[in-house]
């Protein structure tokens, strides 16, 4: 059933402010209805998807390396006493990670150690398990503490290096790659548009752009396997959010703070991205693959 754009706009302001919705994605709980049985292992991807998956894994490696490079620049900026440069390097590093974040979630608990929020922990920012990107963000933007930022960055670099090694030797099933396009947009709808992602730097718009780009890269890889009509529809649906986001990007390619986003543009993004997410969710049917495999009459 197609979602009516007007209805989405009417509901947008209510859903964007719902805190429970923002936590649903973070919890990592799959929607497992009574008619679905999760497969005990990944089913090998059909041959036609393997070049697409291989290209995406190469891109994942490059994005991880780019995030690593920005974190190293962050360390150098801190050593030089340049907090402004360190903060910008953080925002760029998180952008590079968010492009692939929806797929990283597939790699076990990688995202939970690389990108946890303080809200995951009882002691919040004071909890020793609060590490990763948002620990650096807290040190840079809330505490203004270069030493804490250096320590958190060194810790994150170890986890980023571990992710790089996993990407080098592992792969994604085609079903999960396709799912990641939809999930990348859901990251925006569930946390970013409500301003719930970057609580200290307020750099949600940069991450929104990253998640849109992440979904686009998956779709671009799948384009030869999709119908001309689907490719045309998706092209138009990406153009809407792109036009809104362009209003908040400066000549250096940097995005404004979240608070600059007008209520009208926020609702427009919600409407456009909801329609895009619906179309991306339908790709599994067109490609004749699914995220959850059903096993019936299993002994």
Label each PLM-derived region with a short phrase.
Residues 18-22:
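Sec/Tat signal peptide C-region and signal peptidase I cleavage site
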Residues 23-299:
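Mature extracytoplasmic or organellar-lumen-exposed domains after removal of signal/transit peptides
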């Amino acid at each position: 059933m197609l979602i009516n754009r007007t209805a989405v706009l009417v509901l947008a302001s209510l859903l964007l402010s719902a805190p429970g919705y923002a936590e649903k994605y973070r919890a990592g709980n799959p929607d497992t209805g009574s008619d679905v049985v999760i497969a005990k292992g990944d089913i090998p991807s059909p041959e036609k998807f393997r070049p697409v998956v291989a290209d995406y894994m190469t891109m994942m490696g490059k994005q991880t390396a780019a995030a690593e490079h920005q974190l190293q620049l962050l360390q150098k900026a801190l050593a030089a006493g340049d907090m402004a440069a360190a903060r910008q390097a953080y925002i760029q590093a998180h952008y590079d990670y968010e492009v692939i974040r929806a797929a990283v979630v597939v790699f076990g608990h990688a995202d939970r150690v690389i990108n946890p929020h303080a809200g995951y922990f009882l002691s919040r920012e004071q909890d020793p398990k609060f590490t990763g990107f948002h620990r650096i963000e807290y040190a840079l933007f809330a505490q203004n503490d270069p030493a804490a930022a250096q320590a958190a960055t060194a810790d994150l670099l170890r986890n980023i290096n571990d992710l790089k090694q996993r990407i080098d030797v592992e792969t994604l099933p085609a079903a999960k790659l396709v799912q990641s396009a939809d999930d990348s947009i859901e990251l925006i709808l569930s946390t970013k548009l409500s301003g719930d992602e970057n609580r200290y730097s307020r750099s949600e718009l940069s991450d929104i752009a990253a998640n849109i780009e992440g979904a686009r890269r998956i779709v671009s890889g799948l384009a030869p396997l999709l119908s001309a009509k689907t490719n045309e529809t998706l092209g138009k649906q990406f153009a809407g959010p792109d036009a809104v986001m362009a209003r908040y990007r400066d000549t250096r390619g940097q995005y404004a703070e979240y608070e600059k986003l007008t209520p009208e543009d926020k609702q427009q993004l919600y409407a456009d991205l909801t329609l895009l997410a619906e179309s991306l969710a339908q790709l599994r049917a067109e490609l004749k693959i699914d995220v959850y495999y059903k096993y019936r009459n299993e002994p």
